C-alpha cells in the first residue's frame, strides 16, 4: 500500500487531528526558517522550498479555519529583533506578502479582491506592479522632514534600530524635499546591493582573508546590521522606497501617487513600477520584467501587485500575516548544470542523517554554488514516499541530448560523478533536480546510504510510522546523547531561547565544554564548577592561538595567557549565574528542550497541559508504549479511502459477530469505493474478515489513545515519545536533569483581543460592509464567526431580512445587535 507521510498527505484527505498535527509541525518549521532568514541572515532552504511550506500551511488553514492564527508561523512575519541593537516598535506593523507562482493564481487574486469588495467585473480596478527586490526590508521615520529613526523589519512588530548605519547610505536623504511632506512620514523600502558592488565587496573580503558572502542579499543584510557604522559606510548599500507606514497626512490617495510623492521628496523609487488596469496588463509587465531581469544589475525574485487605491486597501485589510490587497508573483527557480564530486552525510540535532551533494562549483543566478541538498535516502534513490519515480533522467537540457542506448529506467537515482541539473530559487541552498544521463560515467555506481551513524557508529534506522504503516523517509541515529554530532546539537537546542534560554552559552562554549568532556548531557550544565570551566576555556583559547600561529607559518610559543583575570573570571561567573537562574523552569520549556522528534513548542505546551510534571509524563508514555496498536490495526486505516472512522466501524461490526463485512448493512455507511479498496488490499471477503479480526486483537489501550487521539498531540508525536523514552540512556539523562532542576506549570496568558473566545453570527443583509469584511473584522478582534446560532453563540449581528437565525437567537437568549451597533463596538475596540 502507498505510504502517506504528513507532508505528502493531500490536505483534502486530512482529518481534523491530522491537520492539527501537520499544522503544528509546519508552523514550527516555518518559524525556525523565519528566525534563520530574518534574524541571522543565514537561511538553510531555498525561497521556493520555503514558499512551498507556507502554501501548504495556508492550504491547511483554508480547509480548517479553526487552525488559522494558532501557530507562530500563521501570524509571524520575520524574526525577533536581535539583542545587539536597540528595539524599535513599528507604529504600523511591517507585514509580509502572500506568494503566487502560476499565472492563473493572479487571475484568482484579482477575482478574490473583487468578491471581497463586491465589485462587478465591469467596474474599473487598478493595481500597481513593481519589481520585488531581494534585499532587507527597512522602515525610515521622518519627523518635520528630518530622518529620526531607521529600523529593520524584525518580527514585523518590533525591529532593530539601525539609524546610525542608515545615515551612511548615500541614497537615503537625511531630509525630505518639498512643501507637502507630512509632519510624520514613515517610508518603507528595501536595502540592497548591486551585482557590481557585491562582486567588489567579495573581492575585498577574499583579499583580506575573510569569508565571502553567499549572495547580495546576505551581504546587504550583514552590512546594514553592523555594530560599527564605519563598516556600513564602506559598503555601497542602495535603497528603493515602495510603501508607507505611519503618516500624519497622506500626500496621495493611491499607491502610484505615493510613489510619485516619494520621488518628489527625494527618495529613490524603482523606475519599473507601473499602474495596470487588467490582469493581462499585470502579466505582461511581469513577463517584461522577467525578461529584463539579468540586465537590471541587482537581484529581484518576482513582481509585487498592489491594489492602487488606498481606500480600497483599507477596506480589504489583512489576513494573518499578509494584506489582502497585495501579492508577490515569484519567478521560477534558476538552474545550472554541474557534476557531483561527493555525497556527504551530516547528522542533525535529532539524529537525522542528512545527505549533501558536494558539487563542482558553478554559478547559479549570480551565486557560486558548491553544495546542494539531497533531502533524504529516498530522494537519492529517485522515489517519493509512495515509491513512485520522481526523476527519470532528462533527454534534452541546454543542448544535452540522450543517447539511444541510455536506459531511462536507470536514471532515477543520483550517483557520485553524475552531471546534474541544479535548481536555485534566490537562496544559498540549492537542490539537485535531475540527472543528465548521457554524461553519467560508465563506472558510476548507486549510492549506498549508510546504516550506521558516521559520527558515532550507532545504528541508523528508518522508524515505523504508526499513522501510515510505513517507514519514515528520514534515517536517524539511535545514539542520542552519546553521539558527538547529535549531542552538541541537542545541547545547543537545550540552551536556546525558546528552551532553557541560558544566556551566554553559544555554539563556541558548547563545543568547548563538550570536547573537554565537561558537558555531554543537559544535567552536566548544572554541575559545572568555576575552576574546570575556566581551565577548559583557557585551554581552548590557547589551542586556537597555536592553530593560527601554525597557519601563519610561525612556531607556537608556550606562554601563559595575558592577565585579564578580572574580566575572564567575571564572564565565567556570569555563565554560572545564568545556569543557576534556570533551576526552575516551566514544564513546557523543559519538554521542548529535550529535542524530541515531532515535539515542537506547541506540542510541548499541549503535553504540559496533560501532565502535571515530568514523572507523570514519562509514566504516561510508558503506559502508552505497553498498549500501543499493532501493524494490522494501523494498516487498516492507511488504505486508500479508508480512514480511522471506517476502521472503527469495521472493528465494531466484527466485534458484533458480523461474518460478511461487505454485506449490505453489515457496516454503517460503507461506500462502494471503500469496499473496492478493501477487496484490493485483502483479496476477498474472508481475507478482509481475517485482517479485521487481527486488527481487533491489536487495538490500542486507553493510555495510548489518551495521547494519540488528542488533536494537539496525535499518533505520530505519540510514537516519537515512545521511541524517545524507550531508550534507557534518554530516560537516565532526563532523570539526571530532574535531580538538578524543578519544573512548574505555566499559567494561561490572558486574551488580548476584544472579542477573544466569543462566537459571533451575522444574519440578514449588511448595508455598510460586505459579509467578508464583517467576518474578517470579527476574527481580527478575536471572535469566531459561525454560520448557525446555538446556546454557545455570544452575539448575533442582524441586518434587514434576518430570518430563522434571529428566531434561534431569541430561543437561546442570545444578545442581538444591529449592524450600526456592531460597527460602533468595532470603532471603540
From Swiss-Prot:
Catalytic activity: NAD(+) + (deoxyribonucleotide)n-3'-hydroxyl + 5'-phospho-(deoxyribonucleotide)m = (deoxyribonucleotide)n+m + AMP + beta-nicotinamide D-nucleotide
Binding positions for Zn(2+) per the UniProt entry: 453, 456, 477, 483
Top-level EC class as recorded in UniProt: ligase
Region (Disordered) residue spans: 1-23
GO biological process: DNA repair; DNA replication
Protein name, entry field: DNA ligase
Coiled-coil stretches: none
A molecular function (GO) term: DNA ligase (NAD+) activity
SUPFAM superfamilies: BRCT domain, DNA ligase/mRNA capping enzyme, catalytic domain, Nucleic acid-binding proteins, RuvA domain 2-like
